[in-house]
UniProtKB/Swiss-Prot annotation:
Keyword hit for Membrane: no
Start and end residues of each Clu domain: 335-580
HAMAP family: CLU
Bias-annotated ranges (Polar residues): 31-40
Function as written in the Swiss-Prot or TrEMBL entry: mRNA-binding protein involved in proper cytoplasmic distribution of mitochondria.
Subcellular location field: Cytoplasm
Protein name stated in the entry: Clustered mitochondria protein homolog
Main location, first listed in the record: cytoplasm
Annotated family: Belongs to the CLU family.
UniProt GO MF annotations: mRNA binding
InterPro entries: CLU-central, CLU_dom, CLU_N, CLU_prot, GSKIP_dom, GSKIP_dom_sf, TPR-like_helical_dom_sf
GO cellular component: cytoplasm
Gene Ontology biological process terms from the UniProt entry: intracellular distribution of mitochondria; mitochondrion organization
C-alpha cells in the first residue's frame, strides 16, 4: 500500500495513480509532517501558502520538499530523522543563508525563507544530551529488525497492525493456490475453535545487526578527558562477538584503546577515523552490521507511516505471544531507561530537571484562537502537551503501584497515600478521612473521579472558556483507581480554606462566592444548561444569601500565577433521581422500580442527555405555542370575530420572532396577550422553570440535602425539570435504542461499541440492566451482547475489590485462579495458595495473608457476580451457573472471557483455551498464562472544533445526497486533524472510512481503497487488533479491493487479481467477529454473504454454499428485516444448489427469493419477473435432469445436464454492492467490464451484459 504521507493534503494535492505528488518530487520516505495544510478561512488575515524548499544534508544528495508556511521548522528536523539516507544522523542544525534557524519558529516567520530557498544541514558538536538522543535513535532504528517486543513496557506507544502481514497486492504472474483461496478450518461456519493464537501479529525473521550497545562503566569522563572533548563512553558488542570501546567526543564517535579492565579513551591506532554517527562507525568495523543494516532499513521503508509512527497516547494489547527466555534479548540501553524511576522519557528534550505540566497546559490552552490559523497552532500545541502529560502520568502510576515512589504522607494508611512525581499529583480512589461517608464511602470516592472528569470534559467544550481546569487523567490499574492531576501554583503552600474563593469545602455548610467568578462562570453556566441559584451560607452564626452558577461542590481557586481555576466539577450535570433513594420520580419510573438503592449518591445524567432533552423540550414548546395560536385563529374564523381575527393574525406574525428568540436563549419581547397566554400554557405543559418564558436549565444542587436554598428559589419547578429529564431517558432514549437493536439499524459488536452508542444517546452504563430486561426475551443480536456486558462489568466490580487486597507477588496466581473460578470449574479453595501460605509461614516464622482470592470457588464467585448485577444494574440473574446463563442467552464464552480480561487490564498468552468446547475443564488457566497488567486510561480528549464542524457539515451533505460536497468537507476535516493531531489519532479511522465510502460513490475507487487501508491499520494500532471498529474497517476494505480489481478486470486474469487479496482480509474479519461476538450478528451475516458470493464466483460451490446458508440463517435468527440483500442471498443459494445439481433445494430457495421480492416491490416489478423466469428455468432443468438420470444411455454426458448459465461477473458485483450498502454512481471501467463479458459469454448474451452495466451505472441500491 502507499505511504501514510497522503493524509496531509488529499484535497489540494495532485493525485497520480492514487498517490500524492505533493510531498517530494522524488519518491522519498518523508516524516508524514511535511505537508500539513490548514484550509483557508475567510476570517484569516494571513493565507497559508505551499512553499518549495531544497534541503542539503550533511551526507547524501539534496532533495526538494513541499510544505505549508505555517509549519514549524521542527517538522523539517523530523523529516530528516525519518529519511533513509539521513535517519542515522541526529546532532545537527538547519542553516539558511549562513544563519541558524530556530526549530520552534514557524516557517513564515524565518527571515529569508522564501519559495525555492535552500536549507543546509550542519553537524553540531555533541553533548551528553545529544549523545543519549543519538543512541536512542540508533536503538529505534535497529529494533525494526527484531521481533517486536510486546511484553515491555505494559503501556507504551508502539502498536502493531495485522493487516500489514496480509498480502493484498495482486500479482499478474503469480497464480493463486487452492490453499490461498479456501478458508482455514477455524473460520468455517459453525466451527467452535476460538484460539487466540491467530490474533497476534505474525513476526518476521529477526535481523540482528549488533548484539549490544551499552554505556561504559568508565562513565562519566574524568576532568582531564572532558577538557579534551570527551562526552560519553560506549561499549558495543558486534555479531562477530567482538567488543569495541567507543568514545563520543564533541566531534563524533571513534574506537578507543580501552579494554575491559583498562581505561584508555584515546583514539585507536587501527582506526583513527572520527565518525558522525555510531551507525557509520559500525558499518566500518563490523562486516555483519554492514550486511544486515541495509536489510533493516529496507524493512523500515516497507512499513508505511501509519504502521510505524508512534501513537500519541499509551496503547496496550490484551494478548501476546508467550514470553520465552530465548526471545527476551539483552539490551543495556533498555535497562538504563526503564529501571531509573526518575526518568520519564522527556528530560533529554527539555531544559531544566522537570516539566511544569500545569504551566504548559494553561499556556497552550490560553493561546489565541480567533482565526483558523491561530486555532490550528493552539490546538496542535495543547494536544501535544496533553499527550505528553498522559504518557508521563501513565509511567508515574505504574511506578507508584510498583512501590518506586515515596508518598508525601507515608505515615498514614496506604489508602490515603498521595504522591507528587514529575510535577504531577496522584491520589488513590478511596474515601480519605470520611469525606464521602454520607454519599457512599469508597464507592462514592471512586465514582467522584469519573464524574469530575466528565465535568472537566464539559468545561473543555465551551466556546470561549474563561476559567482554567486542571490537567487530569484517571487510571484503573491492578484494582486501584489512581487520579493524576496537574498542580495549581501555590496550592501546596496554603490551607484549603485560604485557597478557595468560590464554592464550599465542607459539603455545603459554608459557601463562599466571588463576583469575579460570577462574571467568568455566567457564560459557562449558560452553555452547560446550569441554572444560577441562591443558597444560604452560615458563617459564625450569621446567615447570608449567595449566588452560585455551579454546584456548591465546584471550587474556585486563584493560583499564584494569577489564573482563576475551577475544580471538583463532579456535580456539573444534574443528578439522576432514579438512583437517589428518597428522591421523587415520575409515575413511569415508579412502575419500573425507581428510585432504587445504589452504591453511591453521585449518579448524574450525561451531557448528551441534557442536550437532547433540552432540544426535545424546545421543539415541544414551539409546537405547543404554534398549535394554540393557530387553534385560536381557527376559532376566531368560526365565530367571525373580526377583532379576534386581527389579534390572532398579529400573534401569528410575531410567532417567528418569538421562536428565534427562544432558540437563541434570549428574552421574549412581546406585548401581544395572545402570544403571552400561549407561551404560558406551553411553559406549563413542558414544565419550564419560569411560568412566562421558556427556560429549561438544571440546578445541580436541587436534590442536595447538605445545602440550604434561598426562599426565593422555586425548588419544586427546578426538581420537576430534573425528574422530566430522567424520565425522558426511560421513556424515549432507552426504547429508541432497543428498537434500533431490533431493526438492526445500530449494530454494536463488543462492549466498547455498546458503551459508545449508549453514551451518544445520553444513557449511562448503570442502565444496562434496564436495557437487558427489555431485550432478554427477544431474538435481537443485542441480547447476548448486553447481558454478557452486565456479567463482565459485575465481575470487574467483584474482582477489583479482590485485587486491592491481594499482595503484588500473588497477583499472577490470584488472577489465574479467578479466571479458572469464572470460566472453568473450581470446587475448592486454591491449593496453590494454601501451599504458598504454609511455605511462607515456615520461612518467615509468622503468618502471612494469602489474600481473599484463595477462598474463591466457582460457586462463590458466581454468587458474588449475581449479587453485584442485581445491586448495581438492577438485573437479576436466576441461573445457578455461568454456563447455564451463557446457554440460555446464546452467549459465547470466549467473547465474555475477552471482555472480562480487557476490562480488568490483564495481558494473557495468546493460545487456545478451548472455553467453548463441550468438555469440562477443571483448570483452563495457569500462572504462565498471565503475562502482565496494564492501566485502563480515561482522560479529557482535546479536539479541534474546526474539524468537528467540517465533519458535521460533511455528514449533513451526505444526508442530502451531495456526495461531492461531503467529500470535500471530510477531506478538509482530515487535513485539519492531521495538522493538529498528526497522522495517528483515534478519530481518524472513522473519517477516513467515510472519505473512502464517498470516494467510491464518486467513482474514485483507487483513492477509496487507499483511505480505507489506512483506516484499517490505524484502527488496529490505536483502538485494538480485535476491536469492533477494526472488524468494520476490515469489512469495508474488502469491497474497495474487489471494485479496484473489477476496474482492472479487462487487463488481468480474474482469479489472479481477485481471490487472494480479497478473501484473506474477509477470513480475518470473520475470525475476529467469531472471537469478539459469535456468529449471530448482522455484520457476520454480511461477512458470510461477501465470502459466499466471491467463492460462488470462482465456482467453489460447496464452500460457498456453507457461507451463503450461514448468512441466510443468521439474518433469520436475529430477526433482521427482509430486504433486497436477503433476496439476493436467497437467489445465490438457489444458483449454488443448481450448480451442484440439487434442483429441489434450488427451487425452495428461489421460491423464497420470489416471495421476498413480491413483498418488497409488488408483483409487477422486474426482479419478481426475473425470479419467476428463473423458477421456470430451474423447473425445466430439474425435469430434464431427472429424466436423464432415470433413463441413462451411453450418450449421456453429466456435464450437459447443467445448462443453467451463471450470472455475469458484473451482476455479482452488483450483489456485493447491495450487501455492503453501497450506492454506485458511474464507476469508471464498467464499460470495459461489459465488453469482457461479451467475449466470455458469446454474442447471445451481449445485450444482457450491456443492460447489467447500464443498470450498475444508474441504479440506486439500498
Amino acid at each position: 500500500m502507499t505511504s501514510g504521507s497522503e493524509l496531509k493534503a488529499e484535497v489540494d494535492a495532485p493525485v497520480v495513480n492514487g498517490k500524492d505528488e505533493l510531498v517530494h518530487e522524488e519518491d522519498n520516505n518523508d516524516s508524514g509532517h511535511s505537508s500539513i495544510n490548514t484550509p483557508d478561512a475567510s476570517e484569516d488575515k494571513q493565507t497559508d501558502k505551499l512553499v518549495k524548499v531544497t534541503i542539503q544534508p550533511s551526507c547524501g544528495e539534496a532533495f526538494d520538499l513541499h510544505l505549508s508556511d505555517n509549519e514549524l521548522v521542527q517538522e523539517l528536523y523530523q523529516t530528516l530523522l525519518d529519511r533513509e539516507a539521513t535517519c542515522h544522523r541526529t546532532c545537527f542544525s538547519l542553516y539558511l543563508n549562513g544563519t541558524a534557524v530556530d526549530n520552534y519558529s514557524e516557517v513564515r516567520s524565518v527571515p529569508g525563507f522564501i519559495d525555492g530557498c535552500t536549507l543546509n544541514v550542519v553537524d553540531e558538536p555533541y553533548t551528553v544530551r545529544d549523545a543519549r538522543l543519538h543512541l536512542r535513535q540508533v536503538r529505534e532504528l535497529l529494533r525494526f529488525g527484531l521481533v517486536q517486543d510486546q511484553h515491555e513496557p505494559p503501556c507504551g506507544n508502539e502498536a502493531q497492525s495485522y493487516l500489514a502481514s496480509i498480502d493484498l497486492n495482486p500479482s499478474e504472474k503469480k497464480e493463486s493456490k487452492q490453499s490461498d483461496i479456501l478458508p482455514p478450518d477455524y473460520v468455517l461456519p459453525g466451527c467452535k475453535e476460538r484460539s487466540l493464537a491467530h490474533l497476534v501479529v505474525p513476526q518476521q525473521k529477526e535481523l540482528i545487526a549488533v548484539k549490544d550497545i551499552a554505556f561504559s562503566p568508565f562513565n562519566p569522563p574524568p576532568g582531564p578527558r572532558k577538557l579534551r572533548g570527551d562526552v560519553l563512553y560506549i561499549d558495543v558488542t558486534t555479531v562477530e562477538n567482538r567488543v569495541y570501546h567507543l568514545t563520543c567526543c564533541t566531534r563524533g564517535f571513534y574506537v578507543n584503546n580501552s579494554q575491559e579492565q583498562k581505561f584508555d579513551p584515546t583514539i585507536s591506532n587501527a582506526n583513527k577515523t572520527i565518525y558522525q554517527s555510531v551507525i557509520e562507525l559500525l558499518q566500518n568495523v563490523s562486516p555483519g552490521f554492514k550486511k544486515v543494516y541495509p536489510q533493516i532499513l529496507k524493512r523500515r521503508v516497507e512499513k508505511s507511516l501509519v504502521e510505524r509512527l508512534p501513537t500519541s497516547y499509551p496503547v496496550s494489547t490484551w494478548v501476546a505471544s508467550p514470553l520465552k527466555p530465548d526471545n527476551y534479548s539483552s539490551d543495556s540501553l533498555r535497562a538504563i531507561e526503564l529501571i531509573e524511576p526518575f526518568r520519564v522519557g522527556f528530560e533529554d528534550h527539555m531544559p531544566g530537571l522537570l516539566r511544569d505540566w500545569n504551566e504548559e497546559l494553561q499556556t497552550t490552552f490560553e493561546m489565541p484562537r480567533k482565526s483558523l490559523a491561530e486555532r490550528a497552532v493552539r490546538d496542535r500545541s495543547y494536544y501535544k502537551i496533553h499527550a505528553d502529560y498522559v504518557n508521563a502520568a501513565a509511567k508515574g502510576v505504574q511506578s507508584i503501584l510498583d512501590g518506586n515512589i515515596l508518598a508525601i504522607n507515608p505515615g498514614e494508611d496506604k489508602k490515603t497515600h498521595m504522591y507528587i512525581w514529575n510535577n504531577i499529583f496522584f491520589s488513590l480512589g478511596f474515601d480519605v478521612r470520611d469525606h464521602y461517608k454520607e454519599l457512599g464511602g469508597d464507592a462514592a470516592a471512586f465514582a467522584a473521579t469519573s464524574t469530575d472528569l466528565q465535568g472537566v470534559r464539559a468545561f473543555a467544550t465551551l466556546e470561549d472558556p474563561k476559567l482554567n481546569t486542571l490537567g487530569m487523567a484517571i487510571f484503573d490499574y491492578r484494582g486501584y483507581r489512581v487520579t493524576a492531576q496537574s498542580i495549581i501554583p501555590g496550592i501546596l503552600e496554603r490551607e484549603q480554606e485560604q485557597s478557595v474563593v468560590y464554592g464550599s469545602i465542607d459539603f455545603g455548610k459554608t459557601v463562599v462566592s466571588d463576583e469575579k467568578y460570577h462574571a467568568l462562570l455566567e457564560d459557562a453556566a449558560q452553555q452547560l444548561k446550569m441554572l444560577p441559584h441562591n443558597v444560604i451560607s452560615v458563617k459564625d452564626g450569621v446567615e447570608q444569601e449567595l449566588k452560585l452558577f455551579t454546584s456548591y461542590e465546584a471550587k474556585g481557586i486563584v493560583g499564584n500565577d494569577g489564573r482563576k481555576y475551577v475544580l471538583d466539577l463532579l456535580r456539573s450535570m444534574p443528578p439522576d433521581v432514579h438512583y437517589l433513594e428518597d428522591a421523587e420520580v415520575s409515575e413511569t419510573a415508579k412502575d419500573l422500580g425507581y428510585p432504587r438503592k445504589f452504591p453511591h449518591k453521585l449518579s448524574a445524567l450525561r451531557r448528551e442527555l441534557v442536550d437532547q432533552f433540552c432540544e426535545s423540550r424546545l421543539v415541544m414548546f414551539i409546537q405547543s405555542t404554534a398549535r394554540k395560536i393557530r387553534a385560536l385563529i381557527t376559532e376566531a374564523k368560526e365565530k367571525n370575530d373580526e377583532e379576534l381575527i386581527k389579534q390572532a393574525a398579529e400573534a401569528e406574525s410575531e410567532l417567528s420572532l418569538v421562536f428565534v428568540a427562544v432558540s437563541e436563549d434570549r428574552e421574549i419581547e412581546t406585548k401581544n396577550k395572545i402570544v403571552q397566554d400561549a407561551i404560558k400554557e406551553a411553559c406549563a405543559e413542558i414544565h419550564s422553570i419560569y411560568e412566562d418564558r421558556f427556560v429549561i436549565k438544571f440546578n445541580p444542587d436541587c436534590f442536595s440535602p447538605n445545602v440550604k436554598h434561598a426562599p426565593s428559589e422555586n425548588l419544586e419547578r427546578q426538581r420537576r425539570v430534573v425528574i422530566d429529564a430522567a424520565e425522558y431517558l426511560l421513556t424515549n432514549q432507552i426504547p429508541e435504542i432497543v428498537q434500533s437493536f431490533k431493526d438492526c439499524t445500530v449494530q454494536p459488536i463488543d462492549g466498547n461499541n455498546l458503551a459508545d452508542i449508549l453514551h451518544s444517546k445520553g444513557i449511562n452504563i448503570r442502565y444496562l440492566g434496564e436495557i437487558g430486561k427489555r431485550v432478554q426475551d427477544t431474538n435481537s443480536f443485542a441480547r447476548p451482547l448486553v447481558l454478557s456486558d452486565i456479567v463482565a462489568r459485575s465481575a470487574k466490580h467483584v474482582i477489583r475489590k479482590i485485587n486491592v487486597q491481594t499482595p503484588v507477588d500473588q497477583l499472577v496466581v490470584s488472577t489465574s485462579h479467578i479466571l479458572n473460578c469464572l470460566f472453568s470449574t473450581v470446587s475448592e479453595p486454591s491449593p496453590v495458595a494454601s501451599h504458598a501460605h504454609k511455605k511462607s509461614s515456615k520461612k518467615n516464622g509468622k503468618k502471612k495473608n494469602s489474600g481473599v482470592w484463595a477462598t474463591l470457588t466457582t460457586a462463590s464467585l458466581w454468587k458474588s457476580i449475581c449479587e453485584e448485577s442485581a445491586y448495581y444494574y438492577g438485573y437479576h440473574i436466576d441461573t445457578e451457573t455461568l454456563d447455564k446463563f451463557l446457554e440460555q442467552h446464546e452467549i459465547q464464552k470466549t467473547a465474555l472471557f475477552r471482555r472480562v480480561v480487557k476490562i480488568m487490564g490483564v495481558q494473557i498468552v495468546a493460545r487456545d483455551y478451548q472455553l467453548d468446547s463441550s468438555a469440562k475443564k477443571v483448570a483452563a488457566f495457569t500462572e504462565d498464562d498471565i503475562i502482565n497488567f496494564y492501566p485502563i486510561i480515561k482522560h479529557h480528549q482535546p479536539f479541534t472544533v474546526d474539524a468537528k464542524k467540517m465533519i458535521i457539515r460533511g455528514q449533513h451533505a451526505m444526508s442530502l445526497g451531495a456526495s461531492r460536497e461531503a467529500y470535500e468537507c471530510i477531506s478538509e476535516a482530515i487535513n485539519i486533524m492531521t495538522a493538529v493531531y498528526g497522522v495517528m489519532h483515534p478519530d481518524m479511522p472513522q473519517c477516513l472510512r467515510a472519505l473512502a465510502r464517498l470516494g467510491h460513490v464518486l467513482g474514485e475507487t483507487p483513492d477509496a481503497l487507499n483511505h480505507q487501508h489506512k483506516a484499517t491499520v490505524m484502527s488496529e494500532r490505536l483502538i485494538g487488533l480485535d476491536s469492533g471498529n477494526t472488524i468494520i474497517e476490515y469489512n469495508s476494505l474488502i469491497h474497495y479491493l474487489l471494485i479496484c480489481f473489477q476496474i482492472n478486470l479487462a487487463h488481468f486474469a480474474f482469479g489472479a487479481l481477485l481471490i487472494p487479496g480479497s478473501l484473506r482480509p474477509l477470513y480475518r474479519a470473520r475470525y475476529l467477529m467469531n472471537l469478539v461476538f459469535g456468529e449471530k450478528h448482522p455484520i457476520m451475516a454480511q461477512i458470510d454473504a461477501n465470502i459466499g458470493t466471491i467463492l460462488f464466483t470462482i465456482q467453489e460451490y460447496d464452500t460457498a454454499l456453507k457461507y451463503l446458508q450461514s448468512a441466510d440463517a443468521i439474518s433469520k435468527a436475529i430477526g433482521e428485516p427482509r430486504k433486497l440483500k436477503t433476496g439476493l442471498i436467497s437467489n445465490l443459494i438457489a444458483r449454488t444448489h443448481a450448480a451442484r445439481g440439487d434442483f429441489r433445494a434450488a427451487l425452495v430457495a428461489e421460491k423464497e427469493t420470489s416471495s421476498i421480492y413480491t413483498e418488497l416491490y409488488g408483483k409487477n416489478h422486474q426482479r419478481v419477473k426475473d425470479s419467476g423466469e428463473y423458477l421456470r428455468t430451474l423447473t425445466q432443468q430439474a425435469v430434464t435432469f431427472q429424466k436423464k438420470m432415470l433413463n441413462p444411455d451411453n450418450n449421456t454426458n453429466i456435464n450437459e445436464l447443467f445448462q443453467i448459465q451463471p450470472p455475469p461477473i458484473s451482476a455479482l458485483f452488483d450483489i456485493l454492492n447491495i450487501i455492503n450498502g453501497i450506492m454506485i454512481i458511474g464507476i469508471p471501467g464498467l464499460s470495459n467490464l461489459a465488453a469482457l463479458e461479451k467475449e466470455q459469454i458469446g454474442t447471445a448474451e451481449e445485450s444482457k451484459a450491456t443492460d447489467v452495466a447500464a443498470q450498475l451505472d444508474n441504479e440506486t441500491l439500498d
